[in-house]
Regions:
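Glycine/charged-rich beta-loop-alpha catalytic/anionic-binding loops adjacent to active sites
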Residues: 7-9, 163-172
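Acidic-glycine-rich active-site phosphate/pyrophosphate-binding loop
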Residues: 150-166
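Conserved small/polar residues in nucleotide/adenosyl-binding loops
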Residues: 207-214
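Short glycine/threonine-rich catalytic loop with a Thr-x-Gly-x-Asp
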Residues: 174-185, 209
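Beta-strand->loop->alpha-helix junctions that form or flank phosphate-binding loops
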Residues: 1, 40-42, 120, 131-152, ...
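Phosphate-binding loop of NTP-binding sites
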Residues: 1-120, 124-133, 184, 190-191
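Short beta-strand segments
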Residues: 61, 144, 166-170
Length: 214
């Protein structure tokens, strides 16, 4: 995976929880758009029936960045989402502080010209290189967030807010509350890399959850 991220624009999703859903949703948003992507996922995409998507003409590769055994330190992300940093794998890391330090080091690997999209409120203090933009996201606040959330009749509809745009009336294909926040992160990654507003809206509507992980 390290070689792949050095030879393409790696769009990596890291975090204790939510990375499989977020990376699979991001991959779907890219793959069904004019931008396209290759993707290596930690769960099976129900949209495509596989955890591997190929799009040779696209410069982008979506990857689930796994913190287990510090394997994500081999990556060279162009952009990365960090969803959560709740301590895990303490048999390897030993302490909460060592776990957070591993994520801090991971943020130093994001390449200049790229971006970090980090969930607002995490204990992690990023340490990005000069030239790396940092954005926050969450369900209700941050540079990227949701507004006008409507839940009922078996569906969730949101307005997606970005620093430079607003996409109204996005229907989430999987109407589960946590997918609002995961969806915001995936949409942020897509928006920053040229997926159009209408492609984001259509992609969210048609997205189905991965299996079995998260």
């Amino acid at each position: 995976m390290g070689t792949i991220t050095r030879s393409s624009k790696g769009l990596c999703v890291a975090g204790t929880h939510g990375k499989t859903t977020t990376s699979t949703m991001a991959a779907h948003l890219f793959h069904q758009s004019h931008v396209g992507c290759t993707a290596f996922l930690g769960g099976i995409s129900k949209n495509y029936g596989t955890n591997l998507l190929l799009s040779p003409a696209s410069p982008y590769t979506v990857i689930e960045a796994d913190e287990f055994d510090r394997s994500f330190h081999w990556l060279s992300p162009y952009m990365s989402v960090i969803t959560s940093t709740d301590p895990d794998h303490l048999d390897i890391y030993g302490t909460r502080e060592a776990y957070l330090e591993s994520f801090r080091h991971y943020t130093t690997l994001i390449q200049p010209g790229g971006a970090l999209i980090i969930r607002k409120g995490l204990a992690l203090q990023p340490d990005v290189q000069p030239g790396v933009r940092t954005y926050t996201y969450s369900r209700d606040e941050g540079d990227f967030h949701a507004e006008n959330i409507r839940i009922g009749n078996g569906e969730i509809i949101i307005d997606f807010i970005a620093p430079d745009t607003r996409i109204n009336d996005i229907r989430l294909g999987v109407p589960i509350g946590i997918n609002i926040e995961n969806g915001v992160a995936a949409m942020a990654l897509a928006h920053l890399n040229g997926v159009t507003d209408e492609e984001i809206r259509q992609g969210c509507l048609l997205y189905t959850s991965p299996s079995p992980r998260d």
